[in-house]
Amino acid sequence: RRQGVRTSRKRVARIMSEYGWRGTTRGNARRPRGTGKQAAHAPRVPDLVGRDFSAKGPNEAWFADITYVRTRQGWLYMAAVMDIWSRKVVGWSMGPRMTAELADDALRMAISTRRPGPGCIHHSDHGSQYASLLMGRTMRDAGIRPSMGAISSPWDNAVTESLMGCIKSECVHARTFDSREQAVLEIFDYIEGFYNPVRIHSALGWLSPDEFEKANWKGRTQAA
């Protein structure tokens, strides 16, 4: 579409059928024990987003989530932070355990690379990692406002759910990596070599996150 070529789903399906191609799907993969655990007795955090997945500029709202990938060494967990303005992954961290430190490392990477001004929103689910004292301190020190969607409502964090779905279907896709190291290297290459610079989004006018930022960042500062 962005090259001016008119097409339709039926035409794409016909061409794929002629060449014997099959698209990838996002199935219900097995998940490790303990994922989806909500924080017990955590302080109440308001929803500052309200399913508004848009922003007028960079660093107004970041969305965060954690996913998991199977390897022959065991599960690998990945925490990611996305800037909703450009859909760019601005922070990520991977490790063998789903801890507060994992989520905090991804947030600290985002803070280091983006240097947001006071008032940037960090939106997540109610997972114990995001409700931790460690995350609270990091956000407070950076002037970031915490935000959490409703409990057990994936629609409140739909953009990062979509990101994790892309990683599963386009990078992992029914594979079992030999080691966590192999998974880390391939997911890193997917994010930095494809998702941010190449993968187009309809919400960005069929531009990739990097292309969108290059076209729209002019005259802006790193701070929101």
What are these regions (language model features)?
Residues 1-224:
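Charged DNA-binding/catalytic regions of mobile-element recombinases
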